[in-house]
Amino acid sequence: SISGPSRACMLTGKHSHANGFTDNSSSFDGSQQTFPKLLQQQGYETAVIGKWHLTSEPTGFDHWDILIGQGDYYNPTFIRNGEKVKREGYATNVTTDLALEWLTNGRNQEKPFCLLLHHKAPHRTWMPDTCDFDLFADSNFPLPETFYDSYEGREAAKGQRMSITKDMDLVYDLKLADKDSTIHSRPDLEAAGRRIYNNMNAE
């Protein structure tokens, strides 16, 4: 499953074909019933913070502070109740801090609440926090003997492997570039990778 349609299913309690959001190129119809709207009707204060990626603006939330599209890992831009705000830091830390701030100071402490906290971190391109850049600098992870497989007698597995290769890049997604640079990224993804790093602070 992918995150956008999964999120739409969670919000509506309906399968993707019923809620209309079948892939990440769709636009979520926010006019339909969702569980945050039902909670609002029962007196709950509702909020969503972090990854949204449903194209349309959130509905059924008293407060929302969401990443734009997939969001960026470094110095991400959010949309806070309709206004863009660029924040310095790593997406996981920034999103967590925003949630804690809302829980502590942003909500009515006398009311029950529902907070949806959606992190960027499970999503490609799986970039680490800057403090972890050197975490495995002295480590060497050799490729397993089965990394290059002939798939003899296993045609279904071969087909699945080709699907993974089509959708996931060894360098851009899986960070498998070796010291001799014998594994190369697809050219179209190199530009996307540069955009990610260009969003970082100079230091």
Question: Which stretches of residues belong to each language-model region?
Answer:
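Formylglycine-dependent sulfatase
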Residues: S1-E203
